[in-house]
Amino acid sequence: MFSFVDSRLLLLIAATVLLTRGEGEEDIQTGSCVQDGLTYNDKDVWKPEPCQICVCDSGNILCDEVICEDTSDCPNAEIPFGECCPICPDVDASPVYPESAGVEGPKGDTGPRGDRGLPGPPGRDGIPGQPGLPGPPGPPGPPGLGGNFAPQMSYGYDEKSAGVAVPGPMGPAGPRGLPGPPGAPGPQGFQGPPGEPGEPGASGPMGPRGPAGPPGKNGDDGEAGKPGRPGQRGPPGPQGARGLPGTAGLPGMKGHRGFSGLDGAKGQPGPAGPKGEPGSPGENGAPGQMGPRGLPGERGRPGPSGPAGARGNDGAPGAAGPPGPTGPAGPPGFPGAAGAKGETGPQGARGSEGPQGSRGEPGPPGPAGAAGPAGNPGADGQPGAKGATGAPGIAGAPGFPGARGPSGPQGPSGAPGPKGNSGEPGAPGNKGDTGAKGEPGPAGVQGPPGPAGEEGKRGARGEPGPAGLPGPAGERGAPGSRGFPGADGIAGPKGPPGERGSPGAVGPKGSPGEAGRPGEAGLPGAKGLTGSPGSPGPDGKTGPPGPAGQDGRPGPAGPPGARGQAGVMGFPGPKGAAGEPGKPGERGAPGPPGAVGAAGKDGEAGAQGPPGPTGPAGERGEQGPAGAPGFQGLPGPAGPPGEAGKPGEQGVPGNAGAPGPAGARGERGFPGERGVQGPPGPQGPRGANGAPGNDGAKGDAGAPGAPGNEGPPGLEGMPGERGAAGLPGAKGDRGDPGPKGADGAPGKDGLRGLTGPIGPPGPAGAPGDKGEAGPPGPAGPTGARGAPGDRGEPGPPGPAGFAGPPGADGQPGAKGETGDAGAKGDAGPPGPAGPTGAPGPAGZVGAPGPKGARGSAGPPGATGFPGAAGRVGPPGPSGNIGLPGPPGPAGKZGSKGPRGETGPAGRPGEPGPAGPPGPPGEKGSPGADGPIGAPGTPGPQGIAGQRGVVGLPGQRGERGFPGLPGPSGEPGKQGPSGASGERGPPGPMGPPGLAGPPGEAGREGAPGAEGAPGRDGAAGPKGDRGETGPAGPPGAPGAPGAPGPVGPAGKNGDRGETGPAGPAGPPGPAGARGPAGPQGPRGDKGETGEQGDRGMKGHRGFSGLQGPPGPPGAPGEQGPSGASGPAGPRGPPGSAGAAGKDGLNGLPGPIGPPGPRGRTGEVGPVGPPGPPGPPGPPGPPSGGFDLSFLPQPPQEKAHDGGRYYRADDANVMRDRDLEVDTTLKSLSQQIENIRSPEGTRKNPARTCRDLKMCHGDWKSGEYWIDPNQGCNLDAIKVYCNMETGETCVYPTQATIAQKNWYLSKNPKEKKHVWFGETMSDGFQFEYGGEGSNPADVAIQLTFLRLMSTEATQNVTYHCKNSVAYMDHDTGNLKKALLLQGANEIEIRAEGNSRFTYGVTEDGCTSHTGAWGKTVIEYKTTKTSRLPIIDLAPMDVGAPDQEFGIDIGPVCFL
């Protein structure tokens, strides 16, 4: 049963499902189908083509191939027009029975000649003729272009010649040649299709009559006839067996208030309590007397260095330092704007031979050649005029049978044929009409009892039958089902008080009581002895930085620093405008710190600067060495109270102090957690009888007996609910004094004393904890990428995708099996009634038939596929009907047919003599109620019923008297005393700790207010049976209850003893039996008549009203537990639970307010490339999401007693509403994250372009992306250029050291050498930053390429005596590097422009002995080519040739 809250969830899900509904549904009539623009109704069958057959099944088109029968044994099979399967033209469609074939008729005349067939298809083309001779040469073309254009055309020119000859344009076409001679005639065409068939011949004479057919199938059994009228009423049966025990008595009255229970046994001493927590530090003690002045201490060790002062003013400029060494080459810059076009260079040397040019245009036709040999025959010409008729040729071979012609006109009827032989037996005919009823036959011999038939359909209600003989007494019926509980009776008078029961056994030990309230604070204890000095406290927090000192003198210039390593290549910035001439270069990176100079003189103190903002806390530094102790300073002014320190570890227990006076009683503590269930108590005395078992199935009711005497009153009802707890008993004796308690917490601090004189120097303290970190230093360089974290727990299952598009139609299924035979037809109308037959002898009793109602017909099966089309028989003309043949010989006697349909019921016969009583049959299903019979005479008084079941529990008793006070418990063991806490200011109130085990019992409290009733307790173990109490007075009869549902059958009870016979009822008058009139209105109740004769047994009456409860029966066996009662009223709210486990990390909070403005940054790298081009084609559709991760509402179990409805309990609803609201909030947050990703590891974006679109104001930087979506564990960290939307992936190792990587055995032989493939220490370049998984990056790059339209990458080649691109000596690009793309394509410096890279700086053109660099840039729309994975220089191999590589990030847009 859904609640409305669940339906809200469903609505949410349904709303999202609706999004996925297709929109292509057409409004076609329900169940019809459309194919090729034609509409078919449901169950229509059609053939879209000859060999396919289709059926429309409730809107679905099912098609199947027509399966043809094998015609391999038919030499001249034909396929009729519009059909699929071949048929034998000379096979008659009707079957021939070999034993009586008819005589063959004479052959018909040959039909007239058919029309001439259509011309055959044209023959294949002949082989083409030889080409014609070339035409004459054309006139010369105009002059070619000037020499300046030569380099553009230089596919190949001679190195020795200075210029180049360029062919002119093509001349005009020559004149058309003469037509060629005619070709030879073509080969003979294929044979045309056969002509139409001739008319059919006249039909042959009719064959002889076939022999008689086999006997037809036996007809189906007829339906059962209507039942006869009911017989007359039989005489009354003997008295029925003793009735079942009456239903349970009404609930007893409310019991008297119970006596107070005996005092409980004295409890065991409680376990020792846990060691107490150290007390909170006391307040300062009263000031001590001033001590004598101490000796001056030794000079302390230097203190730790103070925090950095504020930045001083700039010093005067120092003297210029010596120039540092040349720094390493910076990362490659981004491509500059194209320079102005240079002047034409000197003509280069002749290049190597270029590739073969594309095929030229065809030349002008040559002169006509000599005539070629005769060509193959040409295509057939038009048919010539018809020639004269030739002489008849030899008869040709018979042609293939032509296509079947249309049926000829029907020929004249033939003469009647001779009389045929007897035909085959015909198929069984349809059932004839019912014949007239025959005369009744003589009674047959009594047959043996037939087998049990199936149970017929239930007949219509019969008329009353004649009275039967009295039947034998039935077996005692099973107990009837228990009725519904009656309405509450009027409360009976109060019973006499029961005897006081013997005291019960001691119950199990109770669960520990709630902890007592904490006692009030005790009086302050006597002042303790002065404690030994505490260990030194932790260092205080660093104070605010002091005022800035005056500027120091400029220090001497440091020595030049060592050369730093080259930095990682930066991302491409946007292209900047051309700048003005640059300022002098920036100062070099600072060198390592020089030796410490001599300290300058202190400047005078400046004015106090304002305190700087607190820097973020740095990570904790390592423990420094302890400093020398400083001089003892004067005490400073009291600082603000520090934050509470972490609790110290537990100290060693102190000596036991003198016991303090008992404190006043504290406030009540939090209730402890529920204790462990105690061991079960000893078995109690046997309890009272359990509730009666479920009633057995209801037996057939006996004839009603006369009402019995009123039974003795029912048992007193079960005791009422437990009364409220009695008032607390009197206070118990005071317990023995406990052992000495732990020392009290130190008293509150006294007022502060006067400052004493400085004491003697103390021993050096233990080194204090390191102080808090100073303000943060300048940001360090970016660290190396960390190792990948452990794989997180798998995320929740991803949302299921939207429903996919419907699949294509499946292959047509195989041909369906033949459908089931249809349901049997209805029985025909009954014939007229025959005369009454003589009564037959009584049959033997048949064996009882198996029970079972006749099943109804099943629903019709689904539409089968259409069967294959049958062969088309050629229609013959129908002959005249032959004379009837002589009757065939009589067939063999058929086997006995199945039983015919039951004839119509005859008039009721005279009653036959009574047969012997049959064995009792199985209990039939109950028939419909007959008309109510006349009331029977009252039977003899029934035996008194068994004593009724114990009544329901009475009302709750009144509150009991207070119990006696229990004896005082033994004092618990002394707990260990807590360690003395360090003295400090009181900490903030901590959260309540977990409840400790129960302490010893407190003194008796004042009586509390009466609590609300608690929840029902769990059922206790079954007690022993109690003694029977005295009978109470009878209760007033209750109103009859509604009948209850039939329970499962209980065990039969033991038969009760026979009760005393009751007095006979007053006699009634005997009424004459009148005909049954229509039911009149209910009359007033008549007076009791005189005793009549004993009447015949009446029909079964309707169930009477519930009688008054009978006397109590003997106790039944323990019944099963009853169904759970309805839930009680909601109890008071429970105590606060223990603190839950820490929740999961919350979702990231909203972005905080912008921080303060940072310092001006250093000059940034060169800007990114220019604005993006026009938008690319739309990307692939994004994956949908679904809501399968919604939490399913928990399935509520129904109580045994009936369904539990959600709205029955408002608190449940509130909780579930809260749960739904929380789910919806979480869901909307998740959907928001899907729609607007944040680029974090937990919520990665798909590409930087997505981030730019969702968060256009975010800054460029590193973000996480997950192009393949799904689980975010394989997300990768990239740089997002937020101005362009580019996604840039760094290489794993961006810098390849500058050194000699390759020594060639033959340095003069120059060839390209791949760095990763061939060089011994080389490697192919990988991407994704340090610590990333290469497999994850490879997959993500594949998706990134698919979603991008353009990719760019720069590579810087650092060279020493190695040419990278242009060779200065030769002026060509032969020694230029090769690059290998991600799809293993080679990218070159020259050649096809799609596979060539460019350079933005070329400093590696010659061997100068100095380091230079060339910056290569490759930009492509074929994103699969990037990133670059290998590089091959050519100009390497000599010992003085060195190189290094900086690999830039690959950026996708």
From Swiss-Prot:
From start to end residue, where is composition biased (Pro residues)? 131-143, 320-334, 910-920, 985-995, 1031-1046, 1166-1181
Domain of life the protein comes from: Eukaryota
Q: Where are the compositionally biased (Low complexity) regions?
A: 162-176, 187-206, 265-284, 307-319, 350-361, 368-418, 463-482, 527-581, 623-664, 685-722, 800-827, 835-883, 890-908, 997-1021, 1070-1081, 1115-1139
Q: Where is this region: Disordered?
A: 98-1203
- Alphabetical list of InterPro entries matching this protein: Collagen, Collagen_superfamily, Fib_collagen_C, VWF_dom
Question: What molecular functions are annotated in GO for this chain?
Answer: extracellular matrix structural constituent conferring tensile strength; metal ion binding
Q: What is its main location?
A: secreted
Q: What does this protein do?
A: Type I collagen is a member of group I collagen (fibrillar forming collagen).
Q: How does it assemble?
A: Trimers of one alpha 2(I) and two alpha 1(I) chains.
Name this protein carries in UniProt: Collagen alpha-1(I) chain
What is the species listed in this Swiss-Prot or TrEMBL entry? Gallus gallus
Q: Which gene encodes it?
A: COL1A1
